[in-house]
Amino acid sequence: PKQYAPPPASLREAVQVPFQEFFQRRSIGPALAVLAFMALYKLGDNMATALASPFYLEMQFTPTQIGLVAKHAALWPSIIGGLLGALIIVKIGLNRALWIFGFIQLTTIFGYVWLSNAGPDLVILAVVIAGEYLGVGLGTAAFIAFIAREASRLAVATQLAMFTALAALPR
């Protein structure tokens, strides 16, 4: 791979310079708007994921059922969502994909309302989790593409680390 700049000579150069570079590329208002978007885009999914296990237990699913159904129903839909998301982004563009996938992430969370009304049904649990994680995969593909677009080639590793850490804060 082509190296665009020499490696940083110090920790300050590795962290502070990429941070400053991000704000120097745009004025403070747009830079803060981009950072706010990064912090908020996955907020709903992060909160739903954090509350999922306590919700399943309250719904009277056993830990074994949660482990078997929830974990298996999440893996493949999230992988498929990520791959499908990448293909769709190439086809329709990143900005449209961010909106569409954000809406999908929002609507799939309502599957928990269906599950709550249906009661402890393992099939509905699997369908709800699969739908949510398909949306998670789509949204994550768009989000990663967005932060990659916003990162500078001169400081890509540090900026990607900072941006993903910012998005993970609500967890």
Name each model feature, range by range:
Residues 2-33:
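Juxtamembrane intracellular "pre-TM" segments in multi-pass secondary transporters
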Residues 96-146:
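C-terminal transmembrane helical hairpin of 12-TM major facilitator-type secondary transporters
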Residues 50-67:
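Short amphipathic helix-loop junctions that connect adjacent transmembrane helices
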Residues 80-99:
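Helix-to-loop junctions at the C-terminal end of transmembrane segments
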Residues 27-48, 130:
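Pair of pore-lining "gating" transmembrane helices in MFS-fold secondary transporters
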Residues 53, 57, 144-152:
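Helix-terminus/helix-capping segments at the ends of transmembrane helices and short amphipathic helices
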Residues 153-171:
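A late C-terminal transmembrane helix in Major Facilitator Superfamily
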